[in-house]
């Protein structure tokens, strides 16, 4: 568990504390100006709410249909029109039963006409004003306020005439905020004003160290980029003069002006910049969350397996004493006629250990009956010990299997890699047919030879059962988790065999260790036991290479 938690924390720190910037008011201003024309008089056709924190509005105008994506997650809060590619990156899944707030939005906003969009001055709020009709056919005007303010992000629907809230994505009670409550039937109010200055009307001296504190529009990340720029240039930026949106090559930053961000990737539009940047981090977040979840499950299963092995091993140790009962039975049977029946104990000479032993007896039974009782105890213990030994062997195979899963999870690079491993850990009820093909093993061409490397148990199983022919060579690290490596081709040189052994070590949990044993043998000497786990094989006729 600790390993899984530390992995989760490590990746979260990389995502949120090592460069990703938050959506700011100037970016929202640029988005509004860019999309004002399309949204004006457009119609909201369909509303979906994949999770508590994101929404999809299908909007249509003049034959052009776009998906407005709203995210109010504290880490990823933003708004943009999604491309098909970014929708796939976000791994959006629509629930069969929509949430109550989604039902409310559908009731009031589907088929409504957008009258205008607005950004209240300096705020990270996008207002979408709509014209629609109530139950009795009267025209009404509503406003959807999309507040993109970190942990306070929210979506609020209110009546534009009365200012009364109809519903919120998240209700905010007095216990959470004494300044601004949010719930149905309450009046909608803007956040408290910040004591800042509009730089467009300012003509004094700039304190660059406090730029984000003193002026509207300047977030901390944007302030870092414009450090030292003259006042007139700062005004041009806020006026959105000469927009040229870019994302840095390492995806740590985005900027509305390419001149401020070197080593960057040009974006066609502000929307494309927002969409690409945040979907990149959402994809990474989905990957980390699933990887952490699966690693946690693996560690839990490993712990339960280890506990079961220890418990059964203890039982085997106790049952190992059953041999004494056979000895008691043998000694009693050898001395039946030298001793009396119905006694509570008997002293006999043990010829194996050359000593006298005293055996406690059941005084209500004859000596022969006592001997048979000891034989039964011996046979019971022997059978139990044998069954426990078989169970321990199965559990050791399970332990090895889980170690292989753990290795594959840590080596996974894509979300698809994790999805391929997930069924080995999670039994889904009524699983949906997969739309994606199983990932292919890694393939390396070497002249007339081909090398295959499995990235998980499923691929390892596929390599052995489907790809390999009898005389192909199979490689695997000895006594540790790793990929199955297959060398296809006739009579490979020793140098190629050594290269495959190196690959088997590289793709294993012992990749950074020294003196690692790699075994290899022909496919025809591999055997998959009945009911064995995916990727598990036994082997014979193997040879071993020791690698530093």
Residue spans for each PLM region:
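Extended, highly charged segments
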Residues: 4-548
């Amino acid at each position: 568990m600790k390993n899984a938690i530390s992995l989760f924390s490590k990746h979260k720190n990389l995502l949120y504390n090592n460069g990703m910037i938050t959506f700011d008011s100037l970016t929202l201003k640029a988005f509004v100006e860019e999309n004002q024309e399309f949204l004006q008089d457009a119609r909201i056709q369909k509303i979906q709410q994949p999770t508590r924190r994101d929404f999809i509005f299908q909007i249509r105008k003049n034959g052009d249909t776009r998906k407005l994506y709203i995210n109010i997650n504290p880490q990823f809060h933003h708004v943009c029109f999604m491309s098909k590619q970014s929708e796939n990156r976000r791994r959006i899944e629509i629930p069969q039963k929509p949430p109550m707030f989604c039902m409310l939005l559908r009731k009031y906003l589907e088929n409504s006409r957008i009258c205008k969009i607005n950004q209240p001055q300096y705020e990270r709020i996008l207002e979408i004003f709509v014209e629609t009709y109530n139950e009795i056919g009267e025209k009404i005007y509503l406003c959807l306020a999309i507040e993109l303010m970190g942990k306070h992000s929210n979506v609020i629907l209110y009546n534009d005439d009365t200012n009364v809230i109809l519903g919120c994505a998240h209700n905010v009670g007095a216990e959470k905020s004494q300044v601004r409550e949010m719930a149905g039937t309450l009046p909608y109010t803007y956040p408290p004003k910040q004591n800042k200055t509009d730089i467009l009307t300012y003509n004094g001296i700039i304190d660059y160290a406090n730029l984000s504190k003193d002026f509207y529009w300047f977030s901390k990340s944007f302030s870092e980029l414009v450090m030292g720029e003259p006042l007139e240039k700062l005004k041009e930026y806020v006026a959105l003069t000469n927009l040229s949106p870019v994302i840095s090559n390492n995806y740590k930053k985005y900027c509305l002006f390419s001149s401020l961000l070197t080593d960057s990737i040009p974006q066609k539009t502000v929307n494309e910049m927002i969409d690409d940047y945040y979907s990149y981090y959402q994809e990474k977040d989905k990957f980390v969350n699933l990887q952490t979840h699966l690693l946690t499950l693996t560690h839990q299963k490993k712990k339960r397996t280890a506990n079961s092995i220890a418990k059964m091993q203890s039982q085997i140790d106790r049952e190992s004493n059953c041999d004494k009962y056979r000895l008691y039975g043998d000694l009693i049977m050898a001395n039946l006629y030298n001793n009396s029946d119905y006694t509570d104990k008997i002293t006999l000479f043990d010829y194996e250990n050359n000593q006298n032993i005293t055996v406690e007896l059941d005084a209500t039974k004859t000596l022969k009956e006592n001997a048979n009782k000891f034989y039964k105890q011996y046979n019971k213990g022997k059978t139990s010990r044998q069954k426990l030994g078989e169970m321990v062997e199965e559990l050791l195979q399970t332990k090895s299997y889980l170690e292989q899963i753990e290795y594959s999870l840590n080596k996974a690079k894509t979300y698809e890699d994790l999805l391929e491993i997930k069924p080995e850990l999670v039994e889904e009820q009524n699983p949906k047919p997969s739309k994606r093909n199983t990932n292919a093993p890694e393939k390396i061409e070497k002249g007339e030879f081909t090398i295959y490397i499995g990235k998980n148990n499923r691929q390892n199983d596929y390599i052995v059962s489907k790809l390999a022919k009898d005389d192909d060579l199979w490689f695997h690290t000895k006594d540790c988790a790793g990929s199955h490596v297959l060398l296809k081709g006739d009579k490979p040189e020793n140098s190629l065999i050594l290269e495959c052994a190196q690959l088997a070590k590289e793709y294993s949990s012992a990749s950074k260790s020294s003196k690692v044993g790699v075994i290899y043998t022909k496919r025809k000497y591999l055997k998959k036991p009945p009911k064995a786990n995916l990727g598990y094989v036994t082997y014979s006729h193997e040879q071993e290479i020791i690698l530093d």
